[in-house]
Amino acid sequence: MELSADYLREKLRQDLEAEHVEVEDTTLNRCATSFRVLVVSAKFEGKPLLQRHRLVNECLAEELPHIHAFEQKTLTPEQWTRQRRE
């Protein structure tokens, strides 16, 4: 399996039915071992942060063992809209 920001973005978008996904490879030489993600999904509605992160972790269960560092931000569509206005 070859990890890339594009691969992770598409998997998160499909599996979490996300309306917006940003994935940044934060590895020094872009060698795909560290990522920062932002996922906006209605599936996060009514769920606390820990449950949201679990959904993301479950989605990427096969990929996470190959990732050295993983930072995630999970928002509902309403939170995303509000945050962009600020």
UniProtKB/Swiss-Prot annotation:
The modification N-acetylmethionine is found at M1. The keyword Metal-binding does not apply. Keywords: Acetylation, Cytoplasm, Nucleus. One of its GO terms (cellular component) is cytoplasm. It is found in: Cytoplasm; Nucleus. Acts as a cytosolic iron-sulfur (Fe-S) cluster assembly factor that facilitates [2Fe-2S] cluster insertion into a subset of cytosolic proteins. Acts together with the monothiol glutaredoxin GLRX3. This is BolA-like protein 2. The gene is Bola2. InterPro entries: BOL2 (IPR045115), BolA (IPR002634), BolA-like_sf (IPR036065).
